[in-house]
Amino acid sequence: MAATLSVEPTGRSCWDEPLSIAVRGLAPEQPVTLRSVLRDEKGALFRAHARYRADSHGELDLARVPALGGSFSGLEPMGLLWAMEPDRPFWRLIKRDVQTPFLVELEVLDGHEPDGGRRLARTVHERHFMAPGVRRVPVREGRVRATLFLPPGQGPFPGIIDVYGVGGGLLEYRAGLVAGHGFATLALAFYDFEDLPKELNVIEVDYFEEAVRYMLRHPKVKGPDIGLLGLSLGADVCLIMASFLNNVSATVSINGSAFSGNRHIKYKQTMIPPLGHDLRRMKVAFSGILDIVDIRNDAVGGCENPSMIPIEKAKGPILFVAGQDDHCWRSELYTQIASDRLQAHGKERPQVLSYPGTGHYIEPPYFPMCPASLHKIVNEAVIWGGEVKAHSKAQIDAWKQILFFFGKHLGSTHSRASCRL
């Protein structure tokens, strides 16, 4: 009897969906190696492997049988995805074209040899970033450069603006996934994209106000308020929007700092000075890669520092997500300062998700952790922190909590079906 490799859902799934992976038709107690391969849009290969032993019936269910070693060990049904590593140094997995899936090749190899034995079974699974029925709408409205993702159905839907960080450009993959959970989600560029400024010297809040107005005017977006979701500098942009603009009722800050870091923040007559940094405080980590965690100037005065974003002005609740091992900056410390500021101004203590062993790039579930990559400011590779397994668990939990937070405060009751057609 030939071995068969099955993946559920069959054929395709959304990237944030868990998979059930099983092998049948093996010999009792047969040692095998499972291997996964993904090629990104720039040609880089991401790989993982794990050694297993079939049960007495010649079957292997990754939800019931622990890995004996390899890229991971223990009971990790999704380890073949989150434990992937790139074949290029300092390379981060990013999906550029959300209209096409990533193809994940899964193989079963005989034995536990490091280079792999005879191939016993193989399958290819599509991992999509838009659930069936989600619509992608490019937005070039006034100055706004963005992409709107609309859930299936008539709507109107609760709205979210999604902002990424210091890399600039327009990243759509998180917004596409969020839309699959019932939210009209705008992936918003704010520099280094098309005719937007190439460099971000001043954060002009007027631009983001225009994006909020666009969302609230859209017939498929349910007002009167929207939510905001941001990572890193994008998280700080979201905190700025929540502090200065009306019609924001829920904000999620993923490893934000709540400070004006290297740029002035300008809104009408208000100007917030940057905290600034000193590159002489860079260190070299044990790995030989630069560590920039301490280059920012000290937040003298704590929550009353003049470079802090006035988050006490935010109308709605803020969910802070922090990696305790973030090496971009000290997210856990900044989150505590932000909490102190809110409470000092008579606000309730905010909800904080603080994850041990978790680095800077907290992505949707099952994205491989990026331990180090090129940083736009220092123009060299820097470490981002995190331990692979802990970081992966944090991504899964944070995603569930973020979706629940938006559902609670924006009024969505949507529950997404599988990505299968």
UniProtKB/Swiss-Prot annotation:
Its main location: other. Pathway: Lipid metabolism; fatty acid metabolism. Mainly expressed in liver and kidney. Weakly expressed in other tissues including intestine, adrenal gland and adipose tissues. GO terms for biological process: acyl-CoA metabolic process; dicarboxylic acid catabolic process; dicarboxylic acid metabolic process; long-chain fatty acid metabolic process; saturated monocarboxylic acid metabolic process; short-chain fatty acid metabolic process; succinyl-CoA metabolic process; unsaturated monocarboxylic acid metabolic process. It is found in: Peroxisome. Keywords: Fatty acid metabolism, Hydrolase, Lipid metabolism, Peroxisome, Serine esterase. SUPFAM superfamilies: alpha/beta-Hydrolases. Signal peptide: none annotated. The active site is at S232 (charge relay system), D326 (charge relay system), H360 (charge relay system). GO terms for cellular component: peroxisome. Transmembrane segments: none annotated. Coiled coil: none annotated. GO terms for molecular function: carboxylic ester hydrolase activity; fatty acyl-CoA hydrolase activity; succinyl-CoA hydrolase activity. It is an enzyme of class 3 (hydrolase). Its EC number is 3.1.2.3. Belongs to the C/M/P thioester hydrolase family. Catalyzes the hydrolysis of acyl-CoAs into free fatty acids and coenzyme A (CoASH), regulating their respective intracellular levels. In contrast to its human ortholog, functions essentially as a succinyl-CoA thioesterase with no activity with medium to long chain saturated acyl-CoAs and with a low activity toward glutaryl-CoA. This is Peroxisomal succinyl-coenzyme A thioesterase. The gene is Acot4.
